[in-house]
């Protein structure tokens, strides 16, 4: 009977030590949960980067194979035009104030640039 008590005491001590390691020791349950969240976030980041790499690879292939992509980039980013082409710039007119516009009542001329006082 006395041996059973010692065995029970040793098993209870072992169980409490294992529980302590599970909850508070290295590799505890909170740390495992945190690592699982980081794994999910890393998978999402990897997928986003895969899509970006695919997009960049398609753009590189397009630039290597087709002149249209190079021409489009030269026009939009560098403002270049082809020889013999005429470039027209469309400038929007400044809207004229309507009769019921409140700025016209205060003598504000929208066509003239505003001068700041010094």
From Swiss-Prot:
It is a single-pass type II membrane protein. Its main location: membrane. Residues 30-66 form a coiled coil. InterPro entries: Cell_div_FtsB (IPR023081), FtsL/DivIC (IPR007060). GO terms for cellular component: cell division site; cell septum; plasma membrane. Residues 103-118 have a biased composition (Basic and acidic residues). NCBIfam families: PRK00888.1. This is Cell division protein FtsB. It comes from Xylella fastidiosa (strain 9a5c). The lineage of its organism: Bacteria, Pseudomonadati, Pseudomonadota, Gammaproteobacteria, Lysobacterales.
């Amino acid at each position: 009977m006395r041996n059973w008590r010692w065995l029970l005491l040793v098993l209870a001590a072992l169980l409490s030590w294992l529980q302590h390691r599970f909850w508070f020791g290295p590799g505890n349950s909170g740390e495992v949960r945190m690592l699982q969240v980081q794994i999910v976030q890393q998978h999402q980041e990897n997928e986003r980067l895969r899509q970006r790499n695919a997009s960049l690879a398609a753009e590189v292939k397009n630039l290597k194979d087709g002149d249209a992509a190079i021409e489009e980039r030269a026009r939009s980013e560098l403002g270049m035009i082809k020889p013999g082409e005429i470039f027209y710039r469309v400038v929007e007119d400044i809207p004229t104030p309507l009769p019921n516009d409140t700025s016209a009542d205060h003598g504000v001329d929208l066509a003239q640039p505003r001068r700041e006082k010094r």
